Structures are given as structure tokens and as C-alpha cells.
């Protein structure tokens, strides 16, 4: 494998390093989540999904002396959340699907496939009916290189960016971008496909 200060490359996968489990830091974050939930109307359901990244799910690709502590972090958060919060645990589901490309090879984000697999778990947990809807995955870019590639200077690999859309959907929705004071009828910003960071196609970025 190849190693740099920014990221590591193991078995053709760029994997960012992770901080070791810090109980004090995680406890503070968990308290903030509980505080938020306490200020939400009692009739509003609060659901929380903590998503592991590639270093944890692809742990089998790491050298024997490199271990992930994300499971410890997730268990701590789960055990210390208030009863008002439903914790949706997708860790095992993602682990069970490691044969699929759950995370980009050149970026720290998960792929549309990874997000979709987690969504199915979330939908079951909160009672959403997804059986009546079929989805299609469509490639919108085949030359994506993410921040992991930029950070370590390895540009020999490319990722496909796919979007997921309901098949034969008759529904409609509006995405309200509060900070930009604009509304759109789509989750995708196709203008971003002409930029270097094609991941911005999803709602224009963070």
C-alpha cells in the first residue's frame, strides 16, 4: 500500500485515516444531540443515523496493525442517546454489502449505492413504505476524482458518479435552499458536472 499524511491507499482504495476514539469528545457531541432533541416538539419523531466511513467498512483492506475504532464510537453514541431519539444502525448492513462499491475509490464520500443501501435500513426503521417504488441508477460522470486523489497526488483512478431516481414516479417535490433563498424541483444540479468536483451534482454540495 501507499501511505501519506492525508490518506492511505490499500488494495486500490484511497482510505482516509481516522481519529482514535475520544470518549470526552464523543460525549460532548452526544450531549449536543440530546439537547437538540430535547428542544424539539414532543410530537415530532427524532431519528439519528450515524454513518461509518470507508476506513471502518473496508477494514479488511487495512494492514493487520491498523484498526478502526468507529464501531466503539457508534456504540458509545447509541448507548448515551436520550430515549426520545431513535438510533438507526446501518453498520452491519454496510458491512454485509462490502462487495459493492459503497464508497468512492478517490473520495471520502459514500457512493449513491452506499447511500441507497443505508436508506433502505432507515426506511424500515421509521416505517416508510418503499416496496411500491422502484429505482434506477444512472451514470452521469465517469471521470470523477475526489479529494482523496488530490490530497495524496494519485490520479490514475477514476470514479463513476451515479444518481438514483424513482422509476415511473408521478410524485413531485420542492427542494428549499434556505441560505440561497431559492427553490428547485430536483435534488441534482447538472451544471456541476462540468466542474472538477462532480460530487457537487448532489444539491450543489454541502
Predicted regions and their residues:
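Single conserved hydrophobic/aromatic residue that forms the stacking wall/gate
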Residues: 1-6, 10
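Short active-site-adjacent helix-start/loop capping segments
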Residues: 9, 56-59, 96
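Short glycine/proline-rich turn/loop motifs
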Residues: 12-16, 96-101
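Conserved, well-ordered alpha-helix/loop/beta-strand core segments that scaffold catalytic motifs
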Residues: 14-76, 202-206
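Extracellular serine-dependent O-acyl
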Residues: 44-52, 67-100, 121-124
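Catalytic core of nucleotide-activated saccharide and alditol-phosphate transferases
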Residues: 103-106
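Extracellular/periplasmic envelope-modification machinery, especially enzymes
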Residues: 114-206
